[in-house]
């Protein structure tokens, strides 16, 4: 039996792969408790973090609708979380016996909406709402929410596409954006979708999507509408059906925006049922006011451009059996919405059972051959790794059949492909031109494996104005090849940064000379009316005339750049120039005062820099160093530069996360602050590679601009030196470009850290690899 000092454990009520949940008694005062134990002898750091995070978060809330946390105890080499022994069973167990009557459902639903509203008021996103995480007292009908191990206190998060088996939350209940397949960040409204799934199940006895296949379930959340509750429960009041389906909207903007607005609608349903015995129709959402500035993650004024992109995809999808390659060039200045436009077609592409992959050129990594190509195809590998073993083996066979004994030439550029193919024999060295021809031929063969008529491939390459020469040459040769592939190639670039003689223009001219005519989509600034629409969605409770005046001012100052508009609105809100009057239920501002304080006189970079300078000095320092790494960075690279632990760095970066200047790319970051240095030292750190990215290139650029030239050279040199020291020789080839780029960016200082002969040899190794790749 499990042994925990001062606790008598009566029974194990749940056994998971990593956690046991028990009922017991605290012996010091005979208080009944529920105990969550980390069962492994040496728990993983991420599991320790989750348990500590849950304890610290729940114990700080003190909410009646949340199962209380009493204490955290040491248990072997891990931890035990001591919880309130509330209720008798979970809603899952309760639902297994019967679907609750309508009145009982409303009582449960109102309590859950109220508790969720309180959680969101405390900036907590639960992220794993489901019947088994709701405990009910069957005598009183009271319900409480439990299990906050993956809950977040960030305004927004980014979840990249990952194996459905490894997603945060429970797959049957997670929102479309929580699957990581929507190219949008996640916020508190993910909980409304999960609540909608629960309500649907409580009313009908069925989940909206009951498939057991993980990939199919992700597809359902993204692309399929559930059967109407009216079909499953013929007598359900239409207004209650509408409430549930509003919660289940695919886009967060179309759901409820405030849990108390949801609660008000549910209370009106209960009142009618109590007083009249039935629920009649009424307008839902009348009290759905968040009081927060919430800029929608959707496109404005780009409807025709989206249609044009989809038309290109359909031409590729239904093209000639011999294959069809179509190029779309999306142009426009930074922040104008090029990436957002292209990402709009990701769901339709997924619905068509096709692959959407994306890579992004990095201004600081322009010398790395095939960098955006590698990034995009590594994301494809990650998608393939989510498939079943049998399907993955089929892909392996197809790829090897296409590449033959030369697969290693592709693995040199796309190392993650080895996760599917395994170790491959080396390929013979060839002169540079022949090596390049071999690679391009093999790459065309690889593309043909995935780019079939029944599942075309959409390849999106962003920021082509920074693309390396090898990638540009590959694109030119690919489009004029005889590859029998169905590919939609979308390239986005800042046309105002591409002057005559730029390599990208040379590539496009070469493609045109072959008789190839790309589709061109110019993304232009928003009109003043569209800016007004954006602001109306962000602040719906506003005086229309006053909002028009403010919209005109922001349109004039930002020249209709949507990212600039959003940054300006956020800054005005943070500076309390925009305030919500809860008494009157309306947004208020003083236009004259806004013009006086000077915020609207800043250009985009200056505005971002001013916001960066409001952060604590230590946070600013970390962002400056991170900017020298690139648009993405990780704590393990930063830590030795500043001589701090990753845990300390994560704590210092939290203000930047809370301001949405950087975003975490893997969920372990959400629980990092709960760890202790002892946890870090004692636990297995197998899953502690914590990665961030700057929200936008302009934020990265602003942070980089804060670094003085002399300091910049020093940081680059030290980064390169530390990367060299920390990389085993047998793995140095994998990161040789990153090492050399950093050292060369701080070459004067690098020469004081590394022997000149060593520095020359590293550059020679990088050049040799570049030749092999190119």
What is each residue range found by the language model?
Residues 108-109:
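Activation segment signature within eukaryotic-like protein kinase domains
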Residues 172-275, 559:
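C-terminal lobe helix-coil module of Hanks-type protein kinase domains
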Residues 286-293, 329-336, 341-347, 375, ...:
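Short secondary-structure boundary elements
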């Amino acid at each position: 039996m499990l042994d925990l000092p001062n606790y008598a454990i009566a029974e194990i009520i749940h056994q998971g792969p990593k956690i046991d949940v028990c009922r017991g008694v605290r012996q010091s005062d005979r208080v009944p408790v529920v105990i969550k134990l980390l069962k492994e002898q040496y728990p993983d750091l991420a599991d320790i973090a989750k348990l500590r995070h849950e304890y610290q978060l729940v114990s700080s809330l003190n909410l009646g609708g949340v199962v209380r946390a009493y204490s955290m105890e040491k248990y072997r080499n891990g931890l035990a979380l001591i919880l309130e022994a509330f209720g008798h069973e979970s809603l899952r167990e309760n639902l297994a016996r019967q679907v609750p009557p309508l009145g009982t459902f409303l009582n449960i639903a109102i309590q859950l909406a109220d508790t969720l509203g309180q959680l969101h008021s405390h900036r907590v996103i639960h992220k794993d709402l489901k019947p088994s995480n709701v405990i009910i007292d069957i005598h009183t009908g009271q319900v409480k929410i439990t299990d906050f191990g993956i809950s977040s206190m960030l305004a927004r998060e980014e979840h990249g596409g990952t194996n459905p088996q490894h997603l945060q939350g429970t797959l049957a209940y997670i929102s479309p954006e929580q699957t990581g397949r929507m190219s949008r960040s996640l916020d508190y409204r993910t909980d409304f979708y999960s609540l909608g799934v629960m309500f649907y199940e409580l009313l009908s006895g069925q989940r909206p999507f009951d498939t057991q296949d993980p990939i199919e379930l992700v597809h359902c959340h993204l692309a399929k509408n559930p059967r109407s509750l009216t079909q499953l429960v013929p007598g359900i009041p239409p207004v209650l059906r509408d409430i549930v389906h509003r919660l289940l909207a695919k886009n967060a903007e179309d759901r409820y925006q405030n849990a108390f607005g949801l609660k008000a609608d549910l209370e009106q349903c209960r009142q009618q049922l109590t007083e009249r015995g039935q629920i009649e129709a009424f307008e839902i959402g009348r009290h759905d006011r968040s009081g927060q500035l919430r800029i929608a993650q959707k496109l404005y004024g780009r409807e025709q451009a989206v249609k044009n992109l989809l038309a290109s995809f359909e031409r590729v999808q239904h093209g000639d059996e011999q294959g069809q390659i179509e190029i779309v060039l999306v142009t426009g200045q930074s922040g104008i919405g090029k990436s957002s436009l292209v990402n709009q077609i990701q769901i339709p592409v997924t619905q068509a059972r096709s692959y959407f992959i994306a890579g992004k050129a990095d201004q600081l990594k322009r010398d790395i051959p095939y960098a955006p190509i590698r990034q995009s195809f590594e994301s494809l590998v990650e998608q393939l790794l989510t498939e079943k073993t049998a399907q993955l083996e089929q892909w392996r066979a197809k790829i090897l059949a296409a590449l033959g004994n030369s697969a290693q030439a592709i693995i040199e550029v796309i190392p993650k492909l080895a996760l599917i193919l395994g170790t491959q024999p080396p390929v013979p060295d060839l002169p540079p031109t022949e090596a390049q021809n071999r690679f391009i031929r093999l790459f065309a063969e690889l593309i043909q494996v995935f780019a079939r008529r029944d599942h075309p491939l959409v390849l999106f390459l962003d920021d082509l104005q920074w693309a390396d020469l090898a990638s540009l040459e590959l694109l030119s040769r690919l489009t004029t090849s005889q590859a029998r592939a169905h590919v939609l190639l979308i390239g986005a670039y800042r046309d105002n940064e591409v002057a005559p003689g730029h390599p990208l223009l040379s590539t496009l001219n070469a493609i045109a000379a072959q008789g190839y005519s790309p589709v061109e989509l110019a993304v232009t600034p928003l009109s003043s009316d569209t800016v007004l629409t954006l602001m109306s969605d962000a602040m719906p409770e506003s005086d229309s005339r006053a909002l028009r005046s403010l919209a005109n001012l922001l349109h004039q100052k930002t020249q209709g750049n949507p990212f600039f508009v959003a940054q300006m609105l956020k800054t005005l809100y943070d500076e309390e120039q925009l305030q919500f009057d809860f008494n009157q239920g309306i947004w208020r501002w003083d236009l004259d005062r806004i013009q006086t304080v000077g915020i609207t006189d800043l250009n985009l970079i200056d505005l971002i820099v001013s916001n960066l300078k409001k952060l604590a000095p230590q946070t600013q320092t970390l962002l400056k160093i991170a900017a020298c790494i690139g648009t993405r960075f990780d704590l393990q690279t930063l830590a030795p530069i500043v001589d701090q632990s990753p845990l300390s760095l994560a704590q210092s970066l939290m203000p930047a996360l809370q301001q949405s200047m950087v975003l975490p790319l893997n969920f372990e970051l959400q629980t990092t602050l709960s760890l202790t240095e002892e946890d870090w030292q004692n636990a297995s750190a197998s899953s502690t590679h914590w990665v961030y990215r700057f929200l936008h290139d302009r934020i990265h650029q602003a942070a980089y601009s804060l670094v003085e030239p002399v300091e910049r050279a020093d940081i680059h040199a030290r980064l390169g030196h530390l990367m060299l020291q920390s990389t085993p020789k047998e793995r140095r080839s994998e990161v040789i470009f990153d090492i050399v780029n950093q050292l060369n960016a701080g070459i004067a200082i690098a020469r004081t850290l590394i022997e000149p002969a060593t520095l020359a040899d590293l550059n020679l190794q990088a050049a040799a690899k570049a030749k092999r790749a190119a």
